[in-house]
Structures are given as C-alpha cells and as structure tokens.
Regions:
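N-terminal export/targeting leaders of redox proteins
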Residues: 1-21, 98
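Local sequence-structure signature of Cys/Sec-based thiol-disulfide redox active-site neighborhoods
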Residues: 21-30, 40
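The canonical Cys-X-X-Cys-His
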Residues: 28-37, 90
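Extracytoplasmic/secreted proteins, especially bacterial periplasmic and envelope-associated proteins
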Residues: 22, 26, 50, 61, ...
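Gly/Gly-Pro-rich "capping" loops immediately C-terminal to redox-active cysteine motifs
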Residues: 35-64
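Axial heme c-ligation environment in periplasmic c-type cytochrome domains
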Residues: 44, 65-89, 94-97
Length: 98
C-alpha cells in the first residue's frame, strides 16, 4: 500500500513539474518577447502593479483574451501553433510570477 501511494505521489509530482516546465517553455516561445520588456503595453512578468487589475479577471478570462488578442496583443501572442490549453498554461505561469 505504501509503495502504491508513494508511486502515485511521485508520478503526480513529475506531472506537475512537467507542466511547470511546459508553461515556462510556452511563455518563452510565445509571450516573453513582449511580457519581459513591456512591449506595446504588455504587463511585464512579475510586475505586481501592472498585473493587479488584470489578475482580477481570472485565469479563464485572461486566457480567452490571450487566445483572441486584446489591445496591442495579437491572438495567441507569438505562439500561433499553441492550443488553448497551452495558452492557458502560459497565462497561469505569468500569474504565478506576481
């Protein structure tokens, strides 16, 4: 029983780490060009002031905005091959950094 629980715990942690790594890679691929420097008014990664009002919209709305494009941001940012779920991972990654 302990082995069963431990193996599932390890598998869950490996999966969570993979998602974190995936989110970072997606961010670097499609978001960092603007969100690391504030290009065209993009809120910078980790900047609490710039994200404060936006973060109140919640992950789902921010993901939809990123998917559709908003303001100076094109649809899907610079990740035209990303799925909705990948865009969501990138949004979650950015929110976790504030």
């Amino acid at each position: 029983m302990i082995t069963f629980v431990l193996s599932h715990f390890i598998a869950f942690n490996a999966s969570a780490n993979a998602s974190i790594d995936d989110a970072r890679v997606i961010y670097e691929k499609g978001c960092a060009a603007c969100h690391s420097a504030g290009v065209a008014g993009a809120p910078m990664l980790g900047n609490k002031n710039q994200w404060s009002n936006r973060s109140l919209k919640g992950t789902q709305q921010l993901t939809q905005n990123a998917w559709d494009g908003i303001g100076g941001m094109p649809a899907k940012g610079l990740c035209q091959t990303c799925s909705f779920e990948e865009i969501k991972l990138a949004v979650q990654y950015m929110l976790e950094k504030i």
